[in-house]
């Protein structure tokens, strides 16, 4: 990839996480569970939200889309409001991308590790919706 393409990709990811952070700042503390997800996901089965009652984050297993070894993804995660707000990739972003582009699942892992956020992975088998179904 050219340096320009790499810079643009990193910039777009930073914009994404800035948008997520700003939207989560709008949520009040009245909710037991806050969900952050892509709006174009399709789920084969019902999401087991009743299993998401702990104090950590519940991350969607990304290996279904990205391949083995990439269990952490940014497509879907949920947890108590406090934990969802704590999960802020912007806190590690600049150092993480200092040497160039890396895969998003590594950013998720680094954020969880650096911020010491308890978490588990949910096997939701979700996939992005066929664009022709979106109106």
Question: What is each stretch, according to the model?
Answer:
Residues 1-135:
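ER/Golgi luminal nucleotide-sugar-dependent glycosyltransferases, focusing on the catalytic module
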């Amino acid at each position: 990839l050219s340096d320009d393409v790499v810079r643009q990709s990193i910039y777009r990811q930073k914009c994404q996480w800035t948008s997520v952070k700003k939207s989560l700042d709008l949520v009040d503390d009245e909710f037991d569970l806050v969900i952050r997800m892509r709006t174009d996901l399709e789920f084969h089965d019902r999401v087991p939200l009743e299993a998401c009652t702990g104090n950590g984050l519940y991350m969607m297993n990304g290996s279904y889309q990205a391949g083995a070894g990439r269990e952490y993804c940014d497509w879907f995660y949920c947890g108590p409001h406090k934990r969802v707000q704590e999960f802020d990739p912007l806190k590690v972003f600049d150092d993480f991308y200092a040497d160039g582009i890396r895969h998003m699942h590594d950013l998720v892992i680094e954020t969880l590790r650096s911020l010491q956020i308890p978490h588990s992975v949910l096997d939701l088998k979700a996939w992005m919706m066929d664009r022709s179904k979106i109106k």
